[in-house]
């Protein structure tokens, strides 16, 4: 997994609340057996049926910082929702509230989910309305988003922050313990199954 320390990209205003995982990626797109290629399913119902949807606007097609309404990622536990956001190019999502399971899945996959006050979300929406295509710099080390002259703090779980800054997914965490695993396996009787 790639380390996340700082990222600069175009902010995308998703001015909707209660966006559940089925809206992020409908179930019809969940039939793949790989973890990639889900970008076509991202918000597909809105992208297909609403020509004015934010991701249908040229200004935001290459956006990588999603500024969403409250209660983002609710509904069923669906890792595919995180993968779709990342495959599309998003590196960070900010909201005033996330579903816990979505936040956990995001952190494990390398997608930052930062929590801001709703008033700060609305301020960023206003700035993006005034300056479409506004670039934002997400600084995970200092837990800030800089948009023009505006600096906004965000919260993130300390453990997820550490994992993102170290670039550690579950496999990476396990590989940090390879010496201990090998020492344990060396002591196990040969007739027992090996973890290596």
Curated annotation (Swiss-Prot):
GO terms for molecular function: 3-isopropylmalate dehydratase activity. Signal peptide: none annotated. InterPro entries: 3-IsopropMal_deHydase_ssu, Aconitase/3IPM_dehydase_swvl, AconitaseA/IPMdHydase_ssu_swvl, IPMI_Swivel, LeuD. One of its GO terms (cellular component) is 3-isopropylmalate dehydratase complex. Its EC number is 4.2.1.33. It comes from the Bacteria. It holds the Pfam family Aconitase_C. SUPFAM superfamilies: LeuD/IlvD-like (SSF52016). Pathway: Amino-acid biosynthesis; L-leucine biosynthesis; L-leucine from 3-methyl-2-oxobutanoate: step 2/4. It catalyses: (2R,3S)-3-isopropylmalate = (2S)-2-isopropylmalate. It is an enzyme of class 4 (lyase). The keyword Lyase applies. Keywords: Amino-acid biosynthesis, Branched-chain amino acid biosynthesis, Leucine biosynthesis, Lyase. One of its GO terms (biological process) is L-leucine biosynthetic process. Catalyzes the isomerization between 2-isopropylmalate and 3-isopropylmalate, via the formation of 2-isopropylmaleate. Heterodimer of LeuC and LeuD. Belongs to the LeuD family. LeuD type 1 subfamily. NCBIfam families: leuD, PRK01641.1. This is 3-isopropylmalate dehydratase small subunit. It comes from Corynebacterium efficiens (strain DSM 44549 / YS-314 / AJ 12310 / JCM 11189 / NBRC 100395).
